[in-house]
């Protein structure tokens, strides 16, 4: 399944300054029965967003119209806990195209990269600056430049580099998943196979 190409993303951000957000908090286990990737955004942070009677919790950031954007800024150790790709699906389906944190759980990070959500790991100091800027002005924008592997706090011009696997970077820039990538180099694969002596 192809995804939107990711080049440069400029957007305001939704702040979630909570450490150790695990995958069960991102998408509770009772919503994992579906096998299609669509529809999980409705239950992103379900138990934090809604009361037991399904009314919105007005004090949760996703229910606050002051904050919006395609970037989610999370606290340290974002995406820990059990391995469930549904957590990444929920983030994507809600409309986020990037998640910023000072540390990601490896499996969640990999799941995000597989479906077109860019995990941007920054230093704790830069993370604090982002949260402070958004608190001062909720319309604060971030610019994430994937080709250059930089994230910029546009309010101040401060910039930081981030790491990403080269293969995953190429896939995101081209809007590929793993299958798309293989199909794109099909001729090279066939040519290589034809040259094998067996």
What are these regions (language model features)?
Residues 1-198:
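Cytosolic catalytic domains that perform sulfur/thiol-centered chemistry
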């Amino acid at each position: 399944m192809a995804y939107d190409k990711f080049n440069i993303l400029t957007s305001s951000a939704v702040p979630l300054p909570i450490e150790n957000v695990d995958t069960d908090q991102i998408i509770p286990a009772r919503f994992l029965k579906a096998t299609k990737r669509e529809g999980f955004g409705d239950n992103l942070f379900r138990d934090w967003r809604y009361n037991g009677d399904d009314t919105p919790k007005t004090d949760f950031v996703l229910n606050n119209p002051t904050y919006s954007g395609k970037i989610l800024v999370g606290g340290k150790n974002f995406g820990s806990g059990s391995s469930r790709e549904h957590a990444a699906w929920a983030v994507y389906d809600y409309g986020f195209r990037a998640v910023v944190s000072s540390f990601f759980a490896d499996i969640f990070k990999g799941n995000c990269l597989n479906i077109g959500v860019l995990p941007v790991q920054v230093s704790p100091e830069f993370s604090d600056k982002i949260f402070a800027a958004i608190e001062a002005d909720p319309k604060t924008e971030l610019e994430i430049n994937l080709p250059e592997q930089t994230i910029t706090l546009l309010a101040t011009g401060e910039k930081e580099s981030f790491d990403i696997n080269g293969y995953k970077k190429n896939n995101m820039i081209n809007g590929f998943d793993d299958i798309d990538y293989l199909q794109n180099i099909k001729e090279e694969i066939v040519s290589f196979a034809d040259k094998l002596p067996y």
